Amino acid sequence: MSVTGKVAFVTGAAMGLGKAFCKILLENGAKVFMTDVNEAAAQVTLKEFQAQFGVNVVTFMKCDVSSKQQMEDAFKATKEKFGGLDIVCNNAGIGGETDPLWEKAVDINLKGCIRGTHLALQYMRQDQGGRGGVIVNISSMAGLNPNPFGPVYCATKHAIVGFSRSVAMFPETAQNGVRINILCPAFVDTNLVSSLAEENCLHVSKAKIYAHKDGLMTPDYVAEGFLELVTDNSKNGAILKMGKTFGKVYHETSRA
């Protein structure tokens, strides 16, 4: 699947991985609808992208993925702006291990991903008037392994893997032109890692040592894996693991 001329919807697009995903899509000729709750940061990114790629191929709308109404409005606005939808990246995520942040983490990381996936299917399934496409849900290596520093974060990321693979197995999904894949990066040099604190991480000092032990990947490097999941039509229900020490590796799974 070439992304040239395709329309992409990206959550958590203002900084870090989300920004890198938008950038690589734009570099390859896609049109991008950015969403984020951080409007100030998003406007800076938007101006940067519009200066580099043009004002007509990228836009932004403030959107909280934990809000059903805001997500519905953002998807509707994407179709109205660009005429359709081909690529959805459910990327928005936070850390949160203490009250009340852990519930917010579940709302954003998991519920936001589920809501974004349901809306993506609604807009992209060919039997519902869509033209097919691909969904990439952003999990983590913490979605495949235990993480003593962030058990709630770990739980949300495990759930994203299970949910995404399950929906990818629906016969109606692939039969109507939609693929769903999962990206599981290890530690990345983003604000989520640099801002580790007691409210969003347990045993912060040990966690920081662990995070830097094997080195941090750049968002641009992780974006290369993201683009692979978008463009490779043979990938559906695939889990791509990425790490500084082991590169890109597809996770072996069973369908049982």
Predicted features, each with a name:
Residues T98-V106:
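Substrate-binding pocket helix/loop in short-chain dehydrogenase/reductase
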Residues S2-F33:
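Canonical Rossmann dinucleotide-binding motif of NAD(H)/NADP(H)-dependent dehydrogenases/reductases
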Residues I182, C201-R255:
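C-terminal helical subdomain
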Residues N28, N145, S166-V178, N200, ...:
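Active-site-adjacent segment of SDR/Rossmann-fold oxidoreductases
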Residues N28-V44:
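Conserved glycine-rich Rossmann-like NAD(P)H-binding loop of the short-chain dehydrogenase/reductase
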Residues S140:
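Residue(s) in the substrate-gating loop at a strand-loop-helix junction
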Residues T117, T156:
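Active-site helix of classical SDR
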